Amino acid sequence: MSRKYFGTDGVRGKVGEFPITPDFAMKLGWAAGTVMAASGTKEVIIGKDTRLSGYMLESAMEAGFCAAGVNVALTGPLPTPAIAYLTSTFRADAGVVISASHNPYYDNGIKFFSNTGTKLTDEQELEIERLLVSAIEGGAMTCVASDKLGKVRRINDAAGRYIEFCKGTFPNSLSLTGLKIVVDSAHGAAYHIAKNVYRELGAEVISINDKPDGININEHCGATHMDSLQTAVMIHEADLGIALDGDADRLMMVDSKGQVIDGDALLYLLAKSAQQRGEQVSGVIGTLMSNLGFEQALANLGIPFKRAKVGDRYVVELLKETGWRLGGENSGHLLMLDFTTTGDAIVASLQVLRALLESGAGLADAITELNMFPQVLINVRLNGNAAVGLSHPSVSDAVATAESALGNDGRVLLRKSGTEPLIRVMVEAKDAVKANQYAELIADAVRAVFPA
């Protein structure tokens, strides 16, 4: 059975349109609860970000789980990695996050964590889908006996527990005293958490975009819109800036000069710092989107590098397969398995700050030897079958032309987004003009297949 609803990061879409409806959410809760109950599940934890639609979907998921005989514990707005952590520490059987991460407020999504705080396997998601399809298409949604229904409770100290966990990943011998940091919480799930973590560790914190109203999440702010953070760092003459996305699993940073430091650069800094401390860095996992310059810089340190499919779940899978501990995406999902089971922007930022304090260097100076290849990414809106566009002869010809011209001095990647109706065209080259030229060539070929 192929995937019908689960993308690279759970189920996601526009609120009010199938599948992000209360009816679907209830049936998904029931299907997941039924699968989990069969293996002994007694309780799941449900968290969410700050989207207005989170209330509706949370209630629907509750009903579905309770109908399947599974108890529910609610946390309120919390970062995605906080739910992964709490699922494990509370000995819950599974965790659920209601969030569309970096997407606008009118989108939402639902994703699951296992009892170890890791994302569900493909096999588990397919089993949930099997029951879900039967409930949607055949109406086969049953309810357990009245005395077996699930109950709902609220975890009142969830945020405080997670703050202490984050602080616990930072060495006791170090302090952030003397650092001025601007923090952009994207009006998202970490709005009441991130600033307090850094303050309690001694930093002077200027907090921006920390007043969620249900519809301003990720709106011209956070890890996908860095302008406001860059401006704030310069205005306040801060040492650096930290940007999270709506569910705080993605990290981007800004140096004291207002320059953006992306996930590849941060991952390089983390690997180099660990190596300098004498820790064994067996290798680093990136993705198909990771920059060639990043790969070459790791090679100069003697650190092996492998690419996973795009999506943090696939980075985790390859980390487990190789036994390596460090990986991530240039978009800012950073995986540090010595500390967390999933991407955690706050924890990752603390390890970057640790690296800077130990080296005595500023953020820009700490990565001077990293020479990134110019990378051009063009998103083409999809209004048809992606497979048709990706395999169309004219598109294949454009890709072949670009690859032949670039040779070993560049890369071409063409793929369908796992979270949005887009085909992503990425071209990387030593020469920025060539990168842009061939990205436009391929994008034009894709647009011709899917005219607006």
From Swiss-Prot:
Q: Name one Pfam family in it.
A: PGM_PMM_IV
The UniProt annotation places Mg(2+) binding at: S101, D245, D247, D249
Please provide one cellular component term from the Gene Ontology annotations of this protein.
Answer: cytosol
**Positions bearing Phosphoserine:** S101
Q: How is the cofactor bound?
A: Binds 1 Mg(2+) ion per subunit.
> Which biological process annotations from GO are given for this protein?
carbohydrate metabolic process; peptidoglycan biosynthetic process; UDP-N-acetylglucosamine biosynthetic process
Q: Which cofactor does it need?
A: Mg(2+)
Q: Which GO terms describe its molecular function?
A: magnesium ion binding; phosphoglucosamine mutase activity; phosphomannomutase activity
Which InterPro entries does this UniProt record tie to the protein? Answer: A-D-PHexomutase_a/b/a-I (IPR005844), A-D-PHexomutase_a/b/a-I/II/III (IPR016055), A-D-PHexomutase_a/b/a-II (IPR005845), A-D-PHexomutase_a/b/a-III (IPR005846), A-D-PHexomutase_C (IPR005843), A-D-PHexomutase_C_sf (IPR036900), A-D-PHexomutase_CS (IPR016066), Alpha-D-phosphohexomutase_SF (IPR005841)
Which reactions are catalysed by this chain?
A: alpha-D-glucosamine 1-phosphate = D-glucosamine 6-phosphate
> Which keywords does this Swiss-Prot/TrEMBL entry list?
Isomerase, Magnesium, Metal-binding, Phosphoprotein
Which PROSITE patterns does the record match to this protein?
PGM_PMM
- Please state which protein family the record places this protein in: Belongs to the phosphohexose mutase family.
Indicate what this protein is called per its UniProt record.
Phosphoglucosamine mutase 2
Q: Organism, per UniProt?
A: Shewanella amazonensis (strain ATCC BAA-1098 / SB2B)
Q: Which gene encodes it?
A: glmM2
